[in-house]
A protein has these predicted regions:
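Short loop segments at secondary-structure junctions
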Residues: 29-30, 51-53, 62, 126-131, ...
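Acidic, metal-coordinating catalytic segment for phosphate/diphosphate chemistry
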Residues: 9-46, 52-53
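Conserved Nudix-box catalytic region and its N-terminal flanking loop in Nudix hydrolases
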Residues: 2, 48-91, 134, 187
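C-terminal boundary of histidine-terminating zinc-finger modules
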Residues: 170
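Unchanged
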Residues: 34, 43-46, 77-164
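Short beta-strand micro-motifs in enzyme catalytic cores
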Residues: 20-24, 69, 120-122, 143
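A short, amphipathic edge element
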Residues: 1-11
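Generic C-terminal helix-cap and adjacent flexible tail
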Residues: 175-187
Length: 187
């Protein structure tokens, strides 16, 4: 069966700095009309940095939509224009943590909320780390947090970390065997 829904008309309701909201008139595979609310997003990256000792560097920051301060991997949105995912990941890693990486190992692409948003989030594992100075954006207030990878696994396992990109990055690192001896077995 072909599950494709055909777009009939797009009605843009809001155009912001990081997203656009539209309401589409569409046609279901059976020919019946429907309405689809869509949030267009620039896309972004998330980077899980793991050093040679199995330590990870995360960021703690307030996330306004949830009204909570959370712990997550360094991340950010893609800039308008030609910036590729790896370049964006390197930029965000340095801005938020001061780290630069010899290697940016792709962990894949995830779609955080495909039911209403077209955001594509590219995940990386950063290796060969060198510490430098942070350069946070003007509106960004973050704290660097270092911990063993095994401790991060425990925070994911218990649900203390709810951030989807962080959970996905930890899972991909484990599945791809990129944690080395710092895996979660001892937790």
């Amino acid at each position: 069966m072909d599950f494709t829904e055909k777009t009939i008309q797009k009605d843009y309701k809001f155009r912001g700095r990081i997203m656009t909201v539209r309401v589409d008139q569409a046609e279901l595979p059976n020919g019946k009309p429907c309405v689809r609310e869509v949030c267009e997003h620039l896309g972004g990256v998330g980077v899980l940095p793991i050093d040679e000792n199995g330590m990870v560097t995360l960021v703690r920051q307030f996330r306004y939509p949830y009204g909570e301060t959370i712990l997550e991997i360094p991340a950010g949105k893609m800039d308008h224009g030609p910036e590729n995912a790896e370049a964006c990941g390197r930029r965000e890693l340095e801005e938020e943590t001061g780290l630069s990486a010899e290697q940016m190992i792709p962990l894949g692409e995830i779609w955080p909320s495909p039911g209403f948003m077209d955001e594509r989030l590219f995940l990386f594992c950063a290796k060969g780390l060198t510490q430098g100075e942070t350069h946070p954006d003007e509106d960004e207030f973050v704290e660097r947090v270092r911990m063993p990878f095994a401790e991060l696994c425990e925070l994911v396992r218990t649900g203390a970390i709810k951030d989807a990109k962080t959970v996905a990055a930890v899972g991909k690192v484990l599945l791809l065997g990129l944690a080395g001896d710092a895996g979660c077995a001892e937790v």
